[in-house]
Amino acid sequence: MLKNTVSFPAIHTLFETARIKAAASAALAATLAAVALALPSAAGAQQHPTPPQAPLPTTQLSAGIHIIRAEVANTEATRRDGLMFRRELAGNDGMLFVFERPDVQCFWMRNTLLPLSIAFIADDGTIVNIEDMAPQTEDPHCAKKPVRYALEMAQGWFDQHGIKTGKKLDGLP
């Protein structure tokens, strides 16, 4: 009798173990591939939401001799999205945020690519305070007292046009 022979049941067990390991490896590889394919699309969906299908309504505001064309964000969804992912904002264009009632409103710049200035505006149109906001930051920028409106413009717009705290805007909805 040879000492280095392997019985048939032992060979069968070795082949069965190898087959199970191969199947497990294939399943693991398929799972990893599926996860790898899903991650970029999930990350992309979080960073680049689909822009609104319909354009927002606009209104014309005036600050003395200066005319502003403002998109109106007057729903929770439009206020939440604001100017996120926009790559440009024309000269006298901005976004007017309209709230149901006065409150101390706070804004941040998550996913906002443009540097902006924001004017917090009381019910009567008086600017309460103006803040400059850096792109893609989460620092809070808040009204100094309850306001019903906030107007975002390109950073420096208010300063360049001599519009300061206490100035009154006309044409608010």
Give, region by region, the residue ranges found by the protein language model.
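Compact, glycine-rich, soluble single-domain proteins
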Residues: 46-173
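N-terminal secretory signal peptides that target proteins for export/translocation
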Residues: 1-20
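Sequence-pattern detector for short linear motifs
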Residues: 6, 22-24, 82
